[in-house]
Regions:
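Short coil turns that delineate tetratricopeptide repeat
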Residues: 73, 114-115, 149, 600
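Short, conserved micro-motifs composed of acidic
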Residues: 29-38, 116-119, 123, 130, ...
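Periplasmic peptidoglycan-binding/tethering modules of Gram-negative envelope proteins
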Residues: 36, 463-603, 640, 677-678
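Periplasmic OmpA-like peptidoglycan-binding domain that tethers envelope proteins to the cell wall
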Residues: 388, 392-395, 599, 607-678
Length: 678
């Protein structure tokens, strides 16, 4: 196991740089005090002689201490003096490192006299730490941190600095103890179809599991690229999922891609229509790596374009983008100045004008003074995976995950554990939308290895999984059945938590995709916001069993508001033969109430309708009662009574479909609002 010491030179400086720390304390060691009272005259005489540097050399003084300890093995002061002599001599001889010869004397000192001082606990804990005996390091470093005394001298000369070092060593030691005791299940296998005899890496699988994007290294004579001058060429490649559940062998990305010798590290929005990836180009100051984007319009990719000067630095490395589920936050790695260390993870948000803002550093919770890279934000938009050589780990780069709390604050990163993380560099990790499968790139010798670098998958243990997520895909139509075009917002609200998120909308085709978290079986309501558009919503019940990662919503018809127009409010249901609203219907009405309050100048009439089953008179009465129930619910949610002109039932007198079929009758059983004034 590779030990990643944050700065071993600082540790040694803290231990041994000042002669006051060790050597001078030899003369200050007292018998008795808080420790044992020694009555052995010969032992006391030898102890005193061991402190006389002028009369005796180091070997003689050591011999006197050995005789004293032999006579009184539990004598704490003598044992401590011996430990300090050993460490001081080692430093004088230029032998900075671990000092196993001192450990038994330090241990005898603190075990027989815990009040002897704080420093021996620090030295002992540090020695165990440097020897990778993390279990014992935890014990003695914790005792150093917890050392309680009113005597400042017993805390030592460098207590403030040593305390900060001890806390850091304690953090790492606890990590190593924990990771050793929690070996994670790990049975990786190659991803069929993607992996070939060639190298495949920098891979990502789209959230809907239909496509894979990666770099494939191939011989130059197959690459057919004039810019290739080496024996191998890196080609940006895409594979598609086949009906048998395997990816095809992949094809090179056509124009506008593969025009540069270094392209890849891609990410796609959840509708698979907006791609972000990395290109290295020659700049005025040499090669420069930046993030670029392209959009899929009518089956073809638009010309690639830079994310712009706000995001891309003209000098520094900007790479490895990953996009959030709503398409509005992009995370990436960069070595630009202004961060916490070397390579940091940054984020940029898309404004209402569609432009990306100035990047923000993820801060010291995620980034360290070393390097963090290879970020992957899961489709749940609240679980971030990344690689780091700064957080406690076992290799060069280890994989970590962090979760955002309800306020958006990122929690302390967690190491993914062994054997997932190795003593090498572990990067390029991502997770399936349902959260159950982890993916990574490796050229290690793993059972089933196909080529050099391959893409592997494995079942991710539950604690490290993101919240299971599905993608809701739908079509927005205008009142004539044509694709809804122009600026449109798809809002998704968690009924139970009230949390809001947004879908990705194609303003040309009217299609949309939205991510919803389904682990907690919460209900969601989708509402559409567009200038001068009538209220429209669709309820997605968390009680249903989701098969696969894609849920197809019913097409949503968005009508333009017109005075006199009647608009159905979807998902308004009542108890059988009663005017009692179902709980999920109250959610819809709460959203409709918010819509009305956003348009205070709007005045409406609520209308209730039934099918033709049953008595005509009873249907009329029931529709009246139900329309009034809707009116009461809206006023309960804060809609002024003056905004609702009336609530009236029409029974079965105004059908909009054929009552001869169940589907027709279902359409006729409806609640509408009619626009009276706008």
């Amino acid at each position: 196991m590779k030990m990643k010491i944050f700065y071993s030179s600082i540790l040694f400086l803290a231990l041994f740089a000042s002669p006051v720390s060790l050597a001078a304390q030899d003369d200050e060691t007292k018998t008795g005090s808080d420790c044992q009272t020694i009555d052995d005259a010969d032992a006391l005489k030898n102890f005193e002689k061991s402190k006389d540097r002028k009369k005796y050399d180091w070997e003689q003084r050591k011999g006197f201490l050995q005789e004293a300890i032999a006579a009184q093995p539990t004598w704490a002061e003598a044992n401590l003096a011996m430990a300090k002599m050993i460490m001081t001599k080692a430093k004088a001889d230029g032998m900075e490192g671990t000092y196993p010869g001192a450990i038994r004397f330090l241990k005898a000192a603190v075990d027989n006299c815990p009040k002897i001082g704080a420093d021996p606990f620090y030295w002992l804990g540090t020695q165990y730490y440097l020897q990778e005996n993390y279990k014992d390091a935890v014990v003695y470093l914790q005792k150093y941190i917890d050392y309680d005394t009113d005597d400042a001298k017993k805390l030592g000369d460098n207590y403030e600095f040593n305390s900060s070092q001890a806390l850091e060593m304690l953090r790492w030691s606890k990590f190593y103890v924990d990771i050793k005791n929690h070996v994670r299940p790990f049975a990786p296998s190659p991803v069929k179809g993607i992996d070939t005899q060639r190298d495949e890496y920098l891979a990502i699988i789209t959230p809907d599991n239909t496509q894979a994007l990666y770099v494939r290294r191939i011989p130059v004579n197959q690459a057919d690229r004039v810019w290739s001058s080496s024996q191998q060429a890196e080609v940006f490649t895409m594979s598609h999922m086949q009906p048998n559940g395997e990816f095809d062998k992949g094809t090179f990305m056509d124009d506008p891609f593969n025009k540069n010798p270094n392209e890849g590290a891609a990410t796609l929005t959840i509708d698979n229509k907006h791609l972000f990836y990395t290109i290295t180009k020659d700049g005025t100051d040499g090669p420069n790596t930046d993030i670029y984007t392209a959009d899929l319009n009518d089956g073809s990719w638009t010309p690639i374009r830079s994310l712009g000067d706000k995001v891309n630095d003209p000098i520094y490395w900007d790479s490895q983008p990953t996009i959030s589920g709503d398409g509005n936050t992009l995370y990436f790695a960069s070595n630009r100045p202004g961060g916490q260390g070397g390579i940091d993870i940054w984020m940029t948000k898309k404004g209402i004008d569609g432009e990306w803002g100035v990047p923000i550093n993820m801060g010291p919770t995620i980034n360290t003074q070393y390097n963090e890279k290879s970020p992957f934000i899961h489709t749940d938009s609240q679980t971030l995976y990344f690689s780091s050589d700064g957080h406690p780990g076992i290799g060069g780069y280890d994989i970590f995950y962090s979760r955002a709390d309800a306020t958006g604050k990122w929690k302390e990163p967690v190491n993914l554990g062994v054997p997932i993380n190795t003593t090498g560099d572990d990067v390029g990790f991502f997770v399936s939308t349902d959260g159950a499968t982890g993916f990574f790139n490796s050229n290690a010798s793993i059972p089933g290895q196909v080529g050099g670098y391959d893409v592997y998958q494995f079942e991710l243990y539950p604690e490290a999984r993101p919240e299971a997520t599905v993608i809701v895909k739908g079509e927005l139509k205008d009142e004539f059945g044509n694709p809804l075009t122009g600026a449109t917002t798809v809002e998704i609200k968690n009924v139970q938590t009230k949390e809001k998120s947004f879908g990705v909308v194609d303003t040309i085709t009217g299609s949309f995709a939205a991510a919803i978290r389904v682990s907690k079986k919460n209900d969601y309501i989708i509402t559409i916001k567009k200038d001068s558009a009538a209220f429209n919503s669709q309820l997605i019940s968390g009680k249903q069993e989701f098969k696969g990662v894609v849920v197809n919503a019913e097409p949503m018809k968005i009508s333009q508001l017109k005075v006199g127009g009647a608009y159905t409010i979807n998902d308004i249901n009542f108890a059988s033969n009663a005017a009692v609203l179902e709980p999920e219907s109250m959610v819809v009405l709460e959203m409709f109430a918010a819509y009305l309050k956003e348009h205070p100048g709007m005045k409406i009439e609520i209308r209730g309708h039934t099918d033709n089953v049953g008595d005509d008179g009873r249907n009329m009465d029931l529709s009246n009662e139900r329309s009034y129930a809707v009116f009461e619910a809206l006023t309960k949610f804060g809609v002024p009574r003056s905004q609702i002109i009336s609530a009236k039932g029409y029974g079965e007198t105004k059908p909009i479909a054929d009552n001869a079929t169940e589907a027709g009758r279902a359409k006729n059983r409806r609640t509408e609002f009619v626009l009276v004034k706008f």
